[in-house]
């Protein structure tokens, strides 16, 4: 699209450092967004705003402006070189779609562009800004959410299915909510606090999922915040089962144990998920369902586990049984240098005796 003289002048102005005394001029001429002046890094074609620390490339900025029905910025970013087909992805109303078509967009949304933008934002080592931006662009955007979820569904569905045994729960989640949960899982695993806080604030109706994710990813302090401060509740033994889905989840397993969850059920769950470190941790905490656990191991052909459970060498670790309250700081310090007493006993055992 050939830029107008007005958009060219704005582009020149956006490249300059403008004193705060003249911000009112920028606001009046349309170079104002998210309560701040729009500045342009022409070398990398990035829109710079305080709300987006990483900057926005023109296509991403166009998508956000389209999602917000900001006609002025849609035209401006397109004249500055953004691909209007990206804008069409986020056009949720007929007038905005008409504008995108007038500016040269194809009449069908390009699915490849949706996936390109999603993986550009959500990837290993991503930032809070990118996750928040992804949620702004694609949440409450039914077609885009549908396209993304169909592309990554095999990955995310099986991750969630492992956490929630009731498949009806999964079948009732909308594509948009599944996308939100996926983004939250990424943020939680990478400890992206700003993105985590954003999700807590804007998606409270999914709070049970935030509890599930905190249990699964061994996020003790998030779990405590959700359970104690936000008062999010679910069955205690189900919480323990979820904590046992990933190995070495000692912090969240212990938290559930202190709250009163059945440690023998945790022992059985650890075998079901084939998590041996969790199994020995449960034995350290006093689990003694050896016959049931051994039967399950044999049923699943886990013969090494069955052999381990048949040995009469195990006993609770009294040093782990001192806490009486679910204080995350005390739990963290108690387990900071944890090594399994019973796993050591197993490895030191001489089978020839």
From Swiss-Prot:
Keywords, comma-separated and alphabetical: ANK repeat, Glycoprotein, Host membrane, Membrane, Transmembrane, Transmembrane helix
Glycosylated residues in this chain: 172, 342
Disulfide linkage: none
Localisation per UniProt entry: Host membrane
Domain of life according to the entry: Viruses
Record membrane topology: Multi-pass membrane protein
Chain positions of ANK repeats: 57-89
Membrane-spanning ranges: 206-228, 249-271
Signal peptide: none
InterPro entries named in the record: Ankyrin_rpt, Ankyrin_rpt-contain_sf, ASFV_MGF360
GO annotation terms (biological process): taxis
Cellular component aspect of the GO annotation: host cell membrane; membrane
Similarity field: Belongs to the asfivirus MGF 360 family.
Reported function: Plays a role in virus cell tropism, and may be required for efficient virus replication in macrophages.
Protein name: Protein MGF 360-10L
Organism from which the protein derives: African swine fever virus (isolate Warthog/Namibia/Wart80/1980) (ASFV)
């Amino acid at each position: 699209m050939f830029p107008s003289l007005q958009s060219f002048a704005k582009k020149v102005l956006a490249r300059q450092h403008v004193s705060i005394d003249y911000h009112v001029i920028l606001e009046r001429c349309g170079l104002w967004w998210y309560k701040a002046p729009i500045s342009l890094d022409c070398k990398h074609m990035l829109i710079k705003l305080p709300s987006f620390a990483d900057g926005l490339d023109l296509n991403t900025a166009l998508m956000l402006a389209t999602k917000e029905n900001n006609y002025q910025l849609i035209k401006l970013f397109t004249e500055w070189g953004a691909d209007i087909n990206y804008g069409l992805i986020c056009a949720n109303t007929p007038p905005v779609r008409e504008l995108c078509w007038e500016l040269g967009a194809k009449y069908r949304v390009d699915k490849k562009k949706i996936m390109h933008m999603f993986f550009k934002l959500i990837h290993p080592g991503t930032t809070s800004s990118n996750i928040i931006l992804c949620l702004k662009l694609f949440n409450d955007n039914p077609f885009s959410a549908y396209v993304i979820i169909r592309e990554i569904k095999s990955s995310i569905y099986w991750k969630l299915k492992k956490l929630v045994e009731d498949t009806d729960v999964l079948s009732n989640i909308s594509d948009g909510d599944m996308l939100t949960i996926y983004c939250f899982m990424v943020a939680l695993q990478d400890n992206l606090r700003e993105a985590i806080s954003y999700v807590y604030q804007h998606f409270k109706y999914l709070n049970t999922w935030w509890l599930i994710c905190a249990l699964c990813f061994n996020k003790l302090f998030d779990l405590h915040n959700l359970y104690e401060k936000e008062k999010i509740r679910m069955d205690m033994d189900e919480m323990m089962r979820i904590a046992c889905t990933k190995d070495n989840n000692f912090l969240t397993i212990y938290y559930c144990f202190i709250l009163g969850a059945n440690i023998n059920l945790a022992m059985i769950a650890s075998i079901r998920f084939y998590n041996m470190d969790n199994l020995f941790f449960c034995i350290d905490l006093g689990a003694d369902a050896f016959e049931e656990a051994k039967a399950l191991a044999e049923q699943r052909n886990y013969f090494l586990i069955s052999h381990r459970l048949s040995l009469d060498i195990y006993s609770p670790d009294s040093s782990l049984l001192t806490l009486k309250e679910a204080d995350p700081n005390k739990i963290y310090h108690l387990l900071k240098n944890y090594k399994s007493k019973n796993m050591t006993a197993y490895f030191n055992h001489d089978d020839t005796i």
